[in-house]
A protein has these predicted regions:
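Hydrophobic "anchor" residues on beta-strands that sit immediately upstream
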Residues: 94, 128-129, 164
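Conserved C-terminal alpha-helix-loop-beta "cap" of PLP-dependent enzymes
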Residues: 188-189, 193, 263-306
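PLP-dependent enzyme catalytic core of the Aspartate aminotransferase-like
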Residues: 32-35, 159, 282, 296-318
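Conserved glycine-rich beta-strand-loop-beta hairpin in the small C-terminal domain of fold type I
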Residues: 226-240, 252-267
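Conserved core of the PLP fold type I
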Residues: 1-125, 136-157
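Conserved core segment of the aminotransferase class I/II
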Residues: 12, 152-233
C-alpha cells in the first residue's frame, strides 16, 4: 500500500501515533543513526510544523521542548521556500507532514513539493522527516490516487536515512484496534530495532494475523475502501452543500472541498472561529477547539475550524 519494500516496514500495535511518539522519544534520549549526540543534549531544538495541521503531532514535539515553527500551507503542500531557508539552521531537527489529504485541509502534496522535500539538504545531519501517510488509501470521491513512495524519492537524492513514514488501519478496520507501521531505510531499521528490542518483546501478533486474513492484499483493501466511501461521501457532500447554500452567499467564510481524508477545513472571517464554535456548543454541537490546528493551540487569525463529518448519520449532520 505504501509502495516501499517489505524490508523497510516495521509493523506495530494499534496506533501509529505511538510509533511517532516513540521515534521522537528515541531521538531525544538516544539520538538517531546520524546524530552527533542525543537531542536532549542539544542547546536548542526546533521543529517545522506545516499549518494548519494535526494537533497531536504538534503536542508530541511540544512535549519534548521543541520550539515549534509554523510553516504556511499552500495548495501544493508546505511553502518550500520557507522550509528550505529554515533548514539551514542546524537546530531545526525535523518536520511534520500529512502528505495526502492533509489534516485538516485535504491537500495532496504536489510532485514538485515532494521532490523538493526529498532533495532537501538540512544543516542538521540527523534531520527527521516525519511522513504521516494516514490517508494513503482514503479516497471517498473517485478512484484510488497513486502517490509517490517517499522512501525511494529520498534515496534518489542521497537522503535515504532522513525519512520515517507512518500509516495505520485506524480508518480502514477498527479505530483503536487496528495495526500500524513505520517504514524507513534498512539502515534506520537496523538501528531502531536494536532500541525497540529493549523496549518490547513484540506487538499483538494475533491482531496482525486477523488483519492479514481480513485485508488479504492491496486489491481487496482498496475494494474495502470503496465501501467506506459509500458511507463517507454523502456526509461530506452534506457538509459542503450546506456551507455553499447557507454560508457562501454571506461571504464570511471559505473552505476546501476534499476528495479524501477525514476533514473539511473552514476558514471564517478573522477573529470569529472561537465565537463560531461557542455558538455551536450552545446549539448542542461540540467540535474540535478553535486553534487546535495550529502549534501551541494558537491560531493567530482565530479563523480555522476543523469539521469532522464521519461520525454522525447524514440526518444528524443536516
Amino acid at each position: 500500500l505504501l509502495g516501499c519494500k517489505v524490508s523497510q516496514v516495521f509493523v506495530g500495535g494499534n496506533a501509529s501515533l505511538q510509533l511517532m511518539y516513540d521515534t521522537v522519544s528515541k531521538a531525544y534520549t538516544h539520538g538517531l543513526l546520524h546524530s552527533e549526540k542525543p537531542w536532549c543534549k542539544e542547546e536548542s531544538i526546533k521543529w517545522l510544523c506545516p499549518t494548519p495541521g494535526y494537533d497531536r503531532h504538534f503536542k508530541i514535539t511540544e512535549s519534548f521542548g521543541f520550539e515549534l515553527i509554523t510553516i504556511p500551507m499552500t495548495e501544493n503542500g508546505p511553502d518550500m521556500d520557507i522550509v528550505e531557508n529554515l533548514i539551514k539552521d542546524p537546530s531545526v531537527k525535523g518536520m511534520w507532514n500529512v502528505p495526502k489529504y492533509s489534516n485538516p485541509d485535504g491537500i495532496i502534496y504536489s510532485d514538485e513539493t515532494i521532490r523538493r522535500i526529498a532533495s532537501m539538504k538540512p544543516a542538521a545531519p540527523d534531520f527527521l522527516l516525519m511522513w504521516d501517510n494516514a490517508y494513503c488509501i482514503h479516497e471517498f470521491d473517485g478512484d484510488f490516487v497513486p502517490f509517490p513512495d517517499i522512501l525511494s524519492e529520498c534515496e534518489k537524492y542521497g537522503n535515504a536515512d532522513m525519512v520515517f513514514e507512518f500509516a495505520s488501519t485506524s480508518k480502514v478496520t477498527l479505530p483503536g484496534a487496528g495495526i500500524s507501521c513505520f517504514a524507513c531505510s534498512e539502515a534506520n531499521m537496523e538501528y531502531m530495532c536494536k532500541l525497540i528490542g529493549i523496549q518490547a518483546i513484540s506487538f499483538d501478533k494475533m491482531n496482525q494475523l486477523r488483519h492479514v486474513k481480513f485485508l488479504q492484499n492491496k486489491e481487496h483493501t482498496l475494494a474495502l475502501m470503496k465501501e467506506h466511501a459509500k458511507i463517507l461521501k454523502p456526509k461530506f457532500d452534506m457538509v459542503v452543500s450546506t456551507l455553499e447554500r447557507e454560508i457562501a452567499p454571506l461571504g464570511i467564510a471559505t473552505w476546501h472541498k476534499p476528495k479524501g481524508g477525514y476533514f473539511v477545513s473552514v476558514n471564517t472571517t478573522p477573529g470569529l472561529a472561537k465565537r463560531t464554535l461557542a455558538l455551536c456548543k450552545e446549539a448542542g454541537v461540540v467540535m474540535t477547539s478553535a486553534g487546535a490546528t495550529y502549534p501551541y493551540g494558537h491560531d493567530p487569525a482565530d479563523s480555522n475550524i476543523r469539521v469532522a463529518p464521519s461520525l454522525p448519520p447524514v440526518e444528524e449532520l443536516e
